[in-house]
């Protein structure tokens, strides 16, 4: 059985992320979507929310699991008996960073391969950062995220706007 691990912050999970998960699920026996705590970032959604959102969107895939992790990816991949790390590349600008990370992961996990996947054409431009910004400004994000994610975004953006108004 070959297990692939797809790590990311998924803040929020977009249609582009789901596209990669769907395609990876067709290639591997098991795909673990590894939602990172992201210590170096200030996430819009907390870890529990991001895991719940991912489970809502991806729960219908029988060979996909969603889990959170907060330590080294190396340790998480070992715990999951992972053989492959899946990474998405939207543009050449992503490649340099991802190439360096793949090299480091190869050093730390010599038995694990990194598989770079490019998004389907209609998702190449989608990023969680842009989706969050559009949502915070009250824009329509329905083409970029699933309806359940859109509801999460709208509720969180509204709560943040209301909080800002009272401060």
UniProtKB/Swiss-Prot annotation:
State the Gene Ontology BP annotations: coenzyme A biosynthetic process
The GO terms describing molecular function are: ATP binding; pantetheine-phosphate adenylyltransferase activity
Residues annotated as binding ATP: 9-10, 17, 88-90, 98, 123-129
Keywords, comma-separated and alphabetical: ATP-binding, Coenzyme A biosynthesis, Cytoplasm, Magnesium, Nucleotide-binding, Nucleotidyltransferase, Transferase
> Coiled coil located at which positions?
none
Cofactor(s) needed for function: Mg(2+)
The entry's localization annotation reads: Cytoplasm
Q: Does the keyword Transferase apply?
A: yes
Q: Where is this site: Transition state stabilizer?
A: 17
Give the metabolic or biological pathway. Cofactor biosynthesis; coenzyme A biosynthesis; CoA from (R)-pantothenate: step 4/5
What is the main EC category here? transferase
Tell me what reaction this enzyme catalyses.
(R)-4'-phosphopantetheine + ATP + H(+) = 3'-dephospho-CoA + diphosphate
Q: CDD domains, alphabetically?
A: PPAT
Task: Give an example GO cellular component term for this record.
Answer: cytoplasm
**Task performed by this protein:** Reversibly transfers an adenylyl group from ATP to 4'-phosphopantetheine, yielding dephospho-CoA (dPCoA) and pyrophosphate.
Q: How does it assemble?
A: Homohexamer.
Q: Which NCBIfam families match?
A: coaD_prev_kdtB (TIGR01510), cyt_tran_rel (TIGR00125)
The name this protein carries in UniProt is Phosphopantetheine adenylyltransferase
Q: What organism, scientifically named, is this protein from?
A: Bordetella avium (strain 197N)
User: What does UniProt list as this organism's lineage?
Assistant: Bacteria, Pseudomonadati, Pseudomonadota, Betaproteobacteria, Burkholderiales
């Amino acid at each position: 059985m070959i297990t692939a691990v797809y790590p990311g912050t998924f803040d929020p999970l977009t249609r582009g992320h789901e596209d990669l998960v769907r395609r990876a699920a067709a290639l591997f026996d098991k795909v673990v979507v590894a939602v990172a705590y992201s210590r170096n970032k200030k996430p819009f959604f907390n870890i529990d929310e991001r895991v719940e959102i991912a489970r809502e969107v991806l729960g219908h895939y029988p060979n996909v699991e969603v889990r959170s992790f907060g330590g080294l990816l190396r340790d998480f991949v070992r715990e999951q008996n992972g053989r492959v790390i899946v990474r998405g590349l939207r543009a050449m600008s992503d490649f340099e960073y991802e190439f360096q990370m793949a090299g480091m992961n190869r050093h730390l996990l010599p038995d694990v391969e990194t598989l770079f996947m490019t998004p389907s054409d209609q998702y190449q431009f989608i990023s969680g950062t842009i989706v969050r910004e559009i949502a915070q400004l009250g824009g329509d994000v329905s083409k970029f995220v699933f309806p359940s994610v859109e509801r999460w975004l709208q509720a969180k953006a509204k709560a943040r706007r209301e909080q800002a108004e009272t401060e």
